[in-house]
């Protein structure tokens, strides 16, 4: 399927006239449309809630849009909790899923009254040492072994640092009940960026059966089951696209097959999607500033891996559109590069693209999640701006670009003078 950018060349030029490239651009209309589709897919479950994975796109304007569409926040750190709180998202609109958790983070989660998802059985006493335990606590499960769909191994939970065994969960529940906890959640994350409609239903079936066993073993009330994230996006044009309606129906079938007959038809379903919620609705907009002709043809951008780490770090594919040349013949082959002093600073390697000239504007697709958030300052590069393309066609700067003053700010105790 052809990937079409959500912005035209004319609109890009309008924004660039005020906000220089590179910048991350987000599509408000697409974000809202997708959030509503998710909600509709799970409308059969009275308690359903999406807790957006803040790590994917930690911007308060994005969190506010999602909150207006009924989403909460999935936070993993003290800072993410602060960000959520600043937007007015707190209490049971937040789930705190952390690991190797500092005391400061756990205390903040307790103070905010959020759902706390314990990664390890030893955290029961850690939590209790801070005061009365919450009435509702979630526990993260690791089944070990491999996680497969049919004959395909999707991931290896036995190698993951997250979660606890079933026996540890049962022991933690028993201990928490003695301490005063009345309701429990069950959580697991077993695969990342899946592009099959079968992942969530398969995971749901596994967690639903686990919940029944835990209820039978401990007498605990399981109030929600958290499917976490893992639904991916079609980064490549030829990849299949997940159908959230089909996924929601698949989970419903498992729910009625396993939970309802076991008198657990009141269990709420939670999700913690990040990539699925935002990735397709973000572009990294950049200007071509250089071309080089040696053993390969190179096109250099004013963006680099510090703006989008995934291609350099994972070898990940991100589609590239040269704005204004969407229908041009792809008769040139380029490496598309950034300016870091690292040879892996390449957005594309031997990619077929239309002929490119210096000054062309490119849109790098699917950067709405794990794009800006994974940025860094290597080589003294400064993080880019973030811009929201609003539903009415206007645009808003929602994070300014870093300046050299920002970069040097943490040296404020020193005797050095940093000029502009």
Regions found by a protein language model. Name each.
Residues 1-116, 121-129, 133-135, 170, ...:
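A charged N-terminal "starter" segment
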Residues 31, 55, 77, 109, ...:
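Conserved, mostly hydrophobic/aromatic
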Residues 58-61, 83, 125, 146-147, ...:
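Flexible loop/turn segments at secondary-structure boundaries
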Residues 72, 95, 117, 138-140, ...:
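Structured core elements
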Residues 132-146:
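Glycine-rich, aromatic-flanked loop segments that form ligand/cofactor-binding clefts
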Residues 143-289:
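Active-site loop/helix belt of alpha/beta enzymes
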Residues 264-420:
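Charged (often Lys/Glu-rich) extended helix/loop segments that serve as interaction or gating elements
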């Amino acid at each position: 399927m052809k990937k079409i950018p959500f912005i035209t060349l004319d609109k890009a030029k309008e924004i660039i006239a005020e906000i220089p490239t590179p910048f991350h651009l987000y599509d408000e209309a697409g974000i809202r449309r997708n959030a509503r589709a998710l909600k509709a897919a799970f409308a059969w479950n009275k308690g359903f809630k999406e807790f957006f994975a803040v790590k994917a796109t930690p911007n308060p304007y994005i969190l506010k849009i999602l909150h207006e569409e009924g989403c909460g926040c999935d936070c993993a750190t003290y800072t993410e909790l602060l960000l959520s709180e600043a937007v007015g998202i707190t209490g049971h609109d937040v789930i705190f899923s952390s690991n190797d958790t500092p005391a400061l983070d756990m205390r903040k989660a307790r103070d905010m009254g959020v759902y706390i998802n314990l990664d390890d059985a030893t955290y029961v006493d850690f939590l209790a040492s801070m005061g009365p335990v919450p009435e509702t606590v979630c526990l993260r499960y690791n089944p070990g072994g491999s996680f497969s769909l049919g004959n395909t191994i999707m991931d290896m939970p036995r190698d993951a640092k997250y979660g606890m065994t079933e026996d540890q969960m049962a022991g933690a529940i028993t201990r928490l009940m003695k301490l005063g906890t009345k309701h429990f959640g069950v959580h697991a994350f077993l695969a990342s960026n899946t592009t099959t409609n079968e992942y969530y239903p398969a995971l749901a079936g596994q967690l639903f059966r686990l919940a029944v066993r835990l209820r039978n073993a401990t007498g605990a009330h399981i109030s929600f089951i958290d499917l976490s994230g893992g639904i991916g996006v079609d980064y490549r044009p030829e990849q299949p696209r997940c159908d959230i309606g089909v996924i929601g129906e698949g989970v419903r079938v498992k729910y009625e097959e396993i939970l309802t007959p076991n008198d657990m038809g009141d269990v709420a379903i939670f999700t913690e999607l990040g990539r699925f919620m935002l990735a397709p609705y973000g572009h990294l907009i950049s200007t071509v500033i250089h071309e080089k002709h040696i053993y390969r043809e190179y096109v250099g951008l004013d963006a680099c891996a510090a703006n989008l780490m995934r291609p350099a770090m994972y070898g990940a594919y991100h589609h590239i559109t040269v704005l204004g040349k969407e229908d041009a013949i792809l008769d040139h082959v380029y490496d598309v590069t950034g300016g870091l002093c690292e040879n892996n600073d390449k957005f594309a390697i031997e990619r077929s693209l239309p002929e490119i000239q210096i000054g062309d504007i490119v849109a790098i697709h699917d950067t709405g999640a794990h794009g800006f958030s994974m940025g860094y300052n290597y080589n003294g590069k400064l993080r880019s701006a973030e811009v929201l393309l609003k539903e009415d066609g206007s645009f808003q700067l929602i994070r300014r670009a870093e300046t050299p003053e920002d970069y040097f700010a943490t040296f404020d105790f020193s005797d050095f003078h940093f000029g502009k």
